[in-house]
Swiss-Prot record:
<dbReference type="InterPro" id="IPR033663">
    <property type="entry name" value="HSV_TRM3"/>
</dbReference>
<dbReference type="Pfam" id="PF02500">
    <property type="entry name" value="DNA_pack_N"/>
</dbReference>
<dbReference type="InterPro" id="IPR027417">
    <property type="entry name" value="P-loop_NTPase"/>
</dbReference>
<feature type="active site" description="For nuclease activity">
    <location>
        <position position="667"/>
    </location>
</feature>
<dbReference type="GO" id="GO:0003677">
    <property type="term" value="F:DNA binding"/>
</dbReference>
<dbReference type="GO" id="GO:0016787">
    <property type="term" value="F:hydrolase activity"/>
</dbReference>
<keyword id="KW-1188">Viral release from host cell</keyword>
<comment type="function">
    <text>Component of the molecular motor that translocates viral genomic DNA in empty capsid during DNA packaging. Forms a tripartite terminase complex together with TRM1 and TRM2 in the host cytoplasm. Once the complex reaches the host nucleus, it interacts with the capsid portal vertex. This portal forms a ring in which genomic DNA is translocated into the capsid. TRM3 carries an RNase H-like nuclease activity that plays an important role for the cleavage of concatemeric viral DNA into unit length genomes.</text>
</comment>
<keyword id="KW-0378">Hydrolase</keyword>
<dbReference type="GO" id="GO:0051276">
    <property type="term" value="P:chromosome organization"/>
</dbReference>
<protein>
    <recommendedName>
        <fullName>Tripartite terminase subunit 3</fullName>
        <ecNumber>3.1.-.-</ecNumber>
    </recommendedName>
</protein>
<comment type="subunit">
    <text>Interacts with the terminase subunits TRM1 and TRM2. Interacts with portal protein.</text>
</comment>
<comment type="similarity">
    <text>Belongs to the herpesviridae TRM3 protein family.</text>
</comment>
<feature type="short sequence motif" description="Walker B motif">
    <location>
        <begin position="321"/>
        <end position="326"/>
    </location>
</feature>
<feature type="active site" description="For nuclease activity">
    <location>
        <position position="481"/>
    </location>
</feature>
<keyword id="KW-0238">DNA-binding</keyword>
<feature type="short sequence motif" description="Walker A motif">
    <location>
        <begin position="226"/>
        <end position="233"/>
    </location>
</feature>
Amino acid sequence: MLYASQRGRLTENLRNALQQDSTTQGCLGAETPSIMYTGAKPDRWAHPLVGTIHASNLYCPMLRAYCRHYGPRPVFVASDESLPMFGASPALHTPVQVQMCLLPELRDTLQRLLPPPNLEDSEALTEFKTSVSSARAILEDPNFLEMREFVTSLASFLSGQYKHKPARLEAFQKQVVLHSFYFLISIKSLEITDTMFDIFQSAFGLEEMTLEKLHIFKQKASVFLIPRRHGKTWIVVAIISLILSNLSNVQIGYVAHQKHVASAVFTEIIDTLTKSFDSKRVEVNKETSTITFRHSGKISSTVMCATCFNKNSIRGQTFHLLFVDEANFIKKEALPAILGFMLQKDAKIIFISSVNSADQATSFLYKLKDAQERLLNVVSYVCQEHRQDFDMQDSMVSCPCFRLHIPSYITMDSNIRATTNLFLDGAFSTELMGDTSSLSQGSLSRTVRDDAINQLELCRVDTLNPRVAGRLASSLYVYVDPAYTNNTSASGTGIAAVTHDRADPNRVIVLGLEHFFLKDLTGDAALQIATCVVALVSSIVTLHPHLEEVKVAVEGNSSQDSAVAIASIIGESCPLPCAFVHTKDKTSSLQWPMYLLTNEKSKAFERLIYAVNTASLSASQVTVSNTIQLSFDPVLYLISQIRAIKPIPLRDGTYTYTGKQRNLSDDVLVALVMAHFLATTQKHTFKKVH
């Protein structure tokens, strides 16, 4: 039995012995290169293990792989057999009884192709010796030695030397380790970050990962959505304990959603440090919930454990790593204090949480799926393609295209699924499996019900039937939301034409929809848009001869002059008498045929949402569209935008609405919203232009 206080001295003795006996460390001690390329200086590259070679070899994966397998490896205190516990590739060992040799023909050919190095080029020789010195200096760098100690301690931790029980990291746990470890490298070793990234690749089994992808670990924030009981808090405790004990001058923060969780983590970190390391170096301050680990001759490392209920406890602190446990349940009042660390140059926030589908407010992290940087990491047992199959088969517990890997401490089968869903429908998918597809489809607080959308799609009105046409009003309401661009990836001109029931103005029928883009940016944009409106009205009037007048609103928020021009052209060319919504000029008594959209938009959206959910909005069986693709049903085109409606809360407690998607604008939806608003409110005054 050995005291923990003696561990450091024994570790140093073992490391020295390994370095003396190592057969690979001598490679960096070579004074003469194996290859000496004597070309121009810009064309050569000094490699510390090979010599001076052509610079094109910098991009040679074979050389990189050869040096990684046969070159010197960082000497870890634990044996290399323990490294595969968290994904490392084992070192290549050649059996003693096997004598490796080259075939004579191959040897002679290589000797002709590779003449003895020419050591007369003193400049190239100096470059080689400089590269060797630089490589040695990195292996002796204090930060490198600390990082090596962290990897060594992690291997020992997983092999059971601390907890007396071997463990193996899950994929997401390894990711949390990598995000923490590589970020600390990037802030503690700025000048040699890429070199150290490369050195530690083999320890984590990342040989095939490019340096560009490794830079993902330098992100200022990372988010992990993990199912319940998968070891989220366990790995955070291990990471914090090992960082404190092996790395100097590191400040860590831990924020939990409940006080008892923070207290449990605080106690577990103390227990790990005092039992596995020198307890005399551990200082605990229970009043401030801080733990300090003193490093001889270096700056101490600390961790503070706080809760979101004391939102000011972390203000004024400096953290290099801030772990936010169960982040989906953190009080929103505490988020500004947490997100403030994003401004700190050498700080990283790691959000770790389970998935919760009970409330939109506690599932906000999934919104980061659209972030420009790949911040979101989700563990799920079902993919998007098989989501519907999963719902239809009660016996399925995972996606058929996945190779199911369930941690040993998790029970997941059809009986568990059935029992869990009896308590709360859908709980198995979200809480236990990490399924976030329901979040992406807006099922948390669905704005428009699925059955209402299905009715809008399937139950269309036969407006060509004389009996139905006799019940419809004689007025056609048209709303024009013009856009003066020919970029089909941006917003286009949205046009919607509706009418209503003669007896019930709240019952609205959609007769026409247009999504129009300018062919080119010329001076006749107003003419093109107006022509599109006139063509739509002409088609509708041809099918519905009972219509007697057209009431139009041309939005003028983008360009008032163009809106007036559009209204004038429509008034002159329309086959029916036209009346327009007018806006009074503030500086004079003049009224212009345009509509300025203000705060009525939110009310109009709410009115349309109510209409869809109550089936008071319908579409005609002959809904007209001259611009939406012939292969695409205009009503389905509209429904795709209705499904995307989402409310956005404002500071004053009200909401604004949008239907914009990544690959589709909401121009047609906005036009329909406002056309429906004009037809149902009956409060706007329409006047003729001439």
